[in-house]
């Protein structure tokens, strides 16, 4: 992730922060980790202007496919803003590949290989 974030700092990529990122981070009990993540969102994050109603509808349909609520919200948000979806959660990736996810989904290593980031 550090390699990808360094490219975000350089302006090559955008790091889209969703309301789900914020909500998940707000409940982290470790104040140091929580503050570090919030600072990262503030420094590097971009807020996308999307149709939250459509994203919510899509998230609900993904939940019906067996996605967890937070995972469904992350994926729906990525779809709504047309962002590539990067996760380290192999089970989530398996679900994404099984269902009709309209954006690129994979792990950080595959993102770096696909984008030829070194």
Language-model regions: role of each:
Residues 28, 62, 98-99:
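Residue-level signal for well-ordered alpha-helical positions
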Residues 7, 47, 75, 79-118:
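Acidic, PIN/NYN-like endoribonuclease modules and their adjacent C-terminal/linker elements
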Residues 58, 67-74, 83:
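Mid-chain, well-packed structural core segment of small domains
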Residues 20-23, 41-64:
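Acidic catalytic patch
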Residues 62-66, 116-118:
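Short, surface-exposed amphipathic charged segments that create phosphate/polyanion-binding patches used
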Residues 1-30:
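PIN/NYN-family metal-dependent endoribonuclease catalytic core
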Residues 28-42:
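Short, electropositive alpha-helical surface patch
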